[in-house]
Structures are given as C-alpha cells and as structure tokens.
A protein has these predicted regions:
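Acidic catalytic loop of the alpha/beta-hydrolase fold
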Residues: 215-216, 238-243, 267-268
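Short alpha-helix in the alpha/beta-hydrolase fold that links the catalytic acid
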Residues: 70-72, 221-222, 244-253
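C-terminal catalytic histidine-bearing segment of alpha/beta-hydrolase fold enzymes
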Residues: 257-296
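Serine-hydrolase catalytic machinery in alpha/beta-hydrolase-like enzymes
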Residues: 52-156
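Short glycine-enriched nucleophile-adjacent loop
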Residues: 170-179
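Gly/Ala-rich beta-loop-alpha elbow adjacent to hydrolase catalytic centers
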Residues: 161-166, 170
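Short beta-strand/loop motif that positions the catalytic acidic residue
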Residues: 234-236
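Active-site nucleophile loop of the alpha/beta-hydrolase fold
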Residues: 97-98, 208-215, 265
Length: 296
C-alpha cells in the first residue's frame, strides 16, 4: 500500500511520490448530469485527438447525482484543465441511486418548525439500505441495476469514482468487472453479471474512492477475495467522523497496491487544486489502455 499524507503542489498534476508499506444530459466540457429519464449517450464531436475517459460518479448516502455534481463541480473543472495539455478529456457521468430516503432517514434530521407540504420529498437517495439486525444490504440489487443501466446509457465506462456509500459501491463495481474474478451462481452473482454485460466484459482502468468503506456482508466477499486488482486511489479525511478510518482502511487492505491519500478535512470530497492534482496524475497514469481488454 502507498500512503501519503499532506498537501500536493497544484503546479504538479502528476506529483512525484515515494512508496510506503440512469441517464445523462451533456453539459459544458463533456460533463454529464444524471436525470431519471433515458437518453442516448452522445457521440464525440470536435474533440480532435483527445481521448475521452468516461468516469461514472456515485454519490453518497442521502445525496443525488445532481447534488454530488454541484459539490464536485470545481473538482471537475480543475481536472479537465490539468489534463488538457496531454489530450485526455474526462467525461463525468452522474447517476442517482434508486432508493428514495424520507427526511427521517437522514442522520441528524430535526422536523422543521413550520409544516411542509404533504407531498414534499427531499432529493435524497441511497444505493442500498443496511439492515442493522443482520448486517446485510437491502435493495443492493436495485442499486446495481441502476448502475448497469447508467453504464449502458453511456455505452460503457472506463472508471468509477464514489463518495462514502458511493465509494463502497465503486469498489464493488470495480471488483465485479474484473473478468478473471469468479462470480457466485444464482441471485448473489446476478448483479455482477449484469454489470459485465453492460460494460461489454471490459474491466475498469481505475477506481477512486472518497471516504469509502468495506462492504461487509458475507454475500459480497467474493469481491475482495482475491484482492481487487483494478488500480485504486483512496482519499481519507483525517477529521472524518462519519466513516471511521478503520472502515476505510479495511477497504484499502482488500485492494492490490492501493494509493492512499489523507487530507486534513472531514467527511467530504476535497475540491481544491492541491487535492485535484494527485487525482489528475492518477487519471493520467491509468487513463490510457495498456493492453486489450478481455471479452466475456
């Protein structure tokens, strides 16, 4: 595992480091915003020799694709700018989880003093719901089906990036798309087979997790045994009180040669240029196909 703590120079998109033990509406600079209606993925237009890197963005618990994009907009712009000189064009695809949350599901929720409209529903969603009694993930199959549809709508993806619960999902997606990984028979492996079909049997170039954590249900351990081979970058917040550091490190321990960065913040995606730079360097390193991808 490669572990780095501190601040990277924004002037160095690919910093020198040392090693230690769903549907889309296309916006400016090829950024995609998820909606809940189907539309086809657009074709390249006027990008010249730029290589597109399609990155599926998975939001956290109580968020949506729209909200996640709003929170990472500055990060998008910086990444696009840093990669422009080397002719890489990141395409950010935002999907929204299918499981709607009520206000009472939101941690720390307090009823408003003034009554709200009876039909009021916040834009809060989840990829799955944890059953506290059994530890299993309810509605995970629905979450994965939404991701599979997003991949089909995009005509395949090259990478995945997730925050918090979305980070846990990103790890599962990356693992499931590794063609050499054995999948369980029957229902337990159907969601993974659906992902492979959606991405035409292609593995991912890389995966990025912000405040991600290990999915612990026994039925999902095939994703971590053997370790995830897909190149992975993990951002941990030194002041994160929502996802305990041990939970995040349990995930990094299940990844082969992970790159781990610790930022001096809490439970959020750091979007400043100094933290966008190492992400841009990681995309630069792994964005190009190094060998033909395996087919099913």
């Amino acid at each position: 595992m490669r572990l780095f703590v501190g601040i990277f120079s924004a002037a160095r998109p690919n910093p020198t480091i040392t090693r230690r033990a769903s549907s889309f509406t296309f916006l400016s600079h090829k950024v995609c915003l998820s909606t809940m209606t189907a539309s086809p993925s657009p074709k390249p237009n006027g990008n010249g020799s730029k290589k597109e890197i399609k990155i599926l963005m998975l939001h956290g618990f109580t968020q949506s694709g729209t909200l996640f994009r709003a929170k990472t907009r500055a990060l998008e712009k910086t990444i696009v700018k840093l990669l422009n000189p080397i002719s890489l064009l990141p395409v950010f695809l935002y999907a929204t989880g299918p499981n709607r949350l009520s206000p009472e599901d939101i941690p720390g929720y307090q009823p408003p003093e003034e009554p709200q409209a009876e039909d009021y529903q916040p834009d809060t969603w989840a990829w799955f719901r944890k059953d506290e009694a059994s530890g299993n993930y309810r509605l995970l199959e629905e979450g994965m089906a939404t991701i599979s549809q997003a991949i089909r709508d995009a005509e395949g993806i090259d990478a995945v990036c997730g925050f918090s619960q979305g980070g846990a999902m990103a790890a599962l997606v990356a693992a499931a798309l590794e063609p050499e990984r054995s999948l369980p028979e029957g229902k337990e492996g159907d969601w993974a087979r659906g992902l492979r079909e959606a991405n035409s049997g292609h593995s991912l170039n890389f995966a990025v997790m912000y405040s991600g954590f290990l999915a612990t249900p026994d039925s999902l351990q095939f994703c971590f045994e053997p370790k995830i081979k897909t190149p992975s970058l993990h951002f941990l917040g030194s002041l994160d009180t929502v996802v305990d550091e041990n939970r995040s490190r349990a995930l990094t321990d299940r990844c082969q040669d992970p790159l781990v960065l610790v930022h001096p913040g809490g439970h959020h995606v750091p979007v400043s240029k100094q933290w966008a730079a190492p992400l841009a360097g990681f995309i630069k390193e792994h964005g190009q196909d190094k060998e033909p991808k395996a087919e099913l």
